[in-house]
């Protein structure tokens, strides 16, 4: 099964948290990272009184179900010190399951595709970079969605994540 995961960090050594998340995802059984985007530095969305984020997107192949993969990602967040005290607040690591086999799902814990991905440059731009044909079900192609957004605040970060 093909999945798209967005990564973000804005506390501490942001790059190290992103790399640690990649390393932990690589340790998951029955899961293989296929592509890793460049890293982008972005301003916060929603709760604005916090540091800038580093963001990236990965695609992976997994034998887990979408719900199982989500639980694995949440455990990685916990292992890397993620706290959820402020909605959309600062975080060591954020791992969002954006798409899973182009499926539509809405449960108490998971909504696919991610309900706000289509309006977030920090998801769309790195995703498009690693999949030029990417699209969000019922929203359209990533390349078209980006045209409707102001993505000027997204800056390429000089370091690369290693798989």
Please identify what each model-predicted range represents.
Residues 1-31, 37-43:
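N-terminal beta1-alpha1 ligand-phosphate binding loop
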Residues 35-37, 44-53, 64-70, 75-163:
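Flexible, gly/pro- and Lys/Arg-enriched active-site loops
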């Amino acid at each position: 099964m093909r999945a798209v995961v967005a990564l973000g960090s804005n506390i501490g050594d942001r790059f190290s948290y992103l790399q640690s998340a990649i390393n932990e995802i690589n340790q998951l059984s029955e899961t293989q990272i296929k592509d890793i985007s460049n890293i982008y530095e972005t301003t916060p969305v929603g709760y604005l009184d916090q540091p800038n984020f580093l963001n990236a997107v990965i695609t992976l192949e997994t034998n887990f179900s979408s719900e199982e993969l989500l639980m694995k990602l949440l455990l990685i967040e916990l292992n890397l010190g993620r706290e959820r005290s402020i909605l959309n607040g600062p975080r060591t690591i954020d791992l969002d399951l954006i798409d899973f086999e182009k499926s539509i799902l809405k449960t108490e814990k998971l909504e696919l595709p991610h309900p706000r991905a289509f309006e977030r440059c920090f998801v769309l731009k790195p995703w498009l970079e690693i999949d030029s044909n990417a699209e969000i079900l019922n929203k359209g192609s990533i390349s078209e969605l980006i045209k409707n957004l102001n993505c000027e605040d997204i800056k390429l970060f000089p370091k690369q994540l290693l798989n």
